């Protein structure tokens, strides 16, 4: 007979969802008013929230895969910047088309991630060190590619203009309601959730994160799993870079600074264990939304940026502390 999970275990399992609901309610309560209307729940503001979440959310999905195997990827913010620069330079300065530019940027990010996976899985260097070096390398490549300057993106059919089809990624909405960047994030998240539920690879991934030695002895291709996971993370960081470029109409080698920390925070708040072997993409999505709502309500109330950092830090520490208290499953 299967034992039913306790109330405490259920609360911990859905900690990110309950946390998101709590922050959402608090945001409504403490939101500034204008002519009696709650600014936080206005359509424009909620659209801004989900737009802001889309980039971090896409990166955080990839980060979830890496953390599930007990690794970390500190290079994702720099890879985002490299992808944003690449998109801008290829389309504006090199007059490449939309599809070739996007494909090259995505392939570049995937290869970059895979090489980091090779260094971790085959050479045996800790992922923290590998991706810290990767962060510097990606930033350097972005500066070389852009000449150290940001590249503005203007749209049209003439020289030095990006195709108008690229602009549509940022300007259009799905069904008149959902911004395209948010739709991209939703598709990525849903695909990742389904993938982790039904694929044999997901079982290998959790096995490596739970006990790498035991996984190797049981025939799990640990090296291939690690390389694939870092490749996925690089791919999604590049995708986020494309979304970033189209939303800001520019690519800069400084884009994405600090994004790796926000992505890790979303994963931790979502309940994924930094030790590996336990967690979910659904939790990460809730964690990213929680951070987005928190950032937005603090900005609406004109809270000092230093205080905002303090509050976000306390939220992350609280989420990590809850993981320590979580009953063993």
Question: What is each stretch, according to the model?
Answer:
Residues 14-16, 127, 154, 177-185, ...:
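Loop-to-transmembrane alpha-helix initiation sites
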Residues 9-54, 203, 242, 246-254:
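Helix-loop-helix hairpins and the membrane-proximal interhelical loops
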Residues 128-198, 225-228, 249-253:
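Transmembrane helix-bundle core of multi-pass membrane transporters
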Residues 231, 237, 247-313:
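Transmembrane alpha-helical segments in multi-pass inner-membrane proteins
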Residues 1-33, 190-191, 217-224, 294-329:
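Cytosolic-side transmembrane-helix boundaries in multi-pass membrane proteins
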Residues 26-31, 42-94, 98, 118-125, ...:
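Single transmembrane alpha-helix segments in multi-pass membrane proteins
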């Amino acid at each position: 007979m299967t034992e039913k999970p306790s109330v405490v275990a259920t609360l911990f399992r859905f900690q990110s969802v309950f946390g998101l609901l709590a922050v959402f309610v608090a945001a409504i309560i403490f939101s500034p008013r204008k002519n009696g209307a709650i600014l936080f729940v206005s359509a424009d503001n909620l659209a801004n929230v989900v737009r802001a979440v889309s980039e971090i959310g896409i990166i955080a999905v990839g980060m979830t895969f890496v953390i599930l195997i007990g690794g970390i990827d500190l290079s994702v913010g720099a890879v985002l910047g490299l992808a944003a620069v690449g998109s801008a330079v290829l389309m504006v300065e090199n007059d490449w088309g939309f599809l070739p530019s996007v494909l090259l940027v995505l392939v570049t990010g995937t290869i970059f991630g895979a090489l980091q996976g090779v260094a971790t899985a085959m050479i045996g260097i800790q992922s923290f060190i590998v991706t810290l070096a990767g962060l510097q390398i990606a930033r350097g490549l972005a500066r070389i590619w852009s000449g150290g300057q940001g590249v503005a993106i203007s749209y049209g059919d003439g020289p030095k203009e990006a195709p108008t089809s690229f602009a549509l990624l940022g300007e259009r909405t799905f069904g008149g309601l959902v911004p395209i960047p948010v739709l991209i994030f939703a598709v990525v998240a849903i695909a990742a959730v389904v993938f982790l539920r039904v694929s044999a690879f997901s079982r290998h991934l959790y096995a490596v994160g739970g006990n790498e030695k035991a996984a190797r002895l049981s025939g799990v291709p640990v090296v291939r799993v690690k390389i694939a996971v870092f490749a996925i993370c690089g791919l999604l960081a590049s995708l986020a870079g494309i979304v970033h470029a189209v939303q800001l109409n520019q690519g800069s080698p400084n884009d994405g600074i600090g994004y790796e920390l926000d992505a890790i925070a979303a994963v931790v708040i979502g309940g994924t264990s930094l030790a590996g072997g336990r967690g979910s993409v659904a939790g990460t999505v809730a964690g990213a939304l929680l951070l987005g709502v928190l950032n937005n309500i603090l900005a609406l109330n004109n809270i000092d940026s230093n205080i905002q950092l303090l509050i976000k830090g306390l939220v992350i520490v609280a989420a990590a502390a809850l993981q320590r208290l979580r009953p063993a499953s």
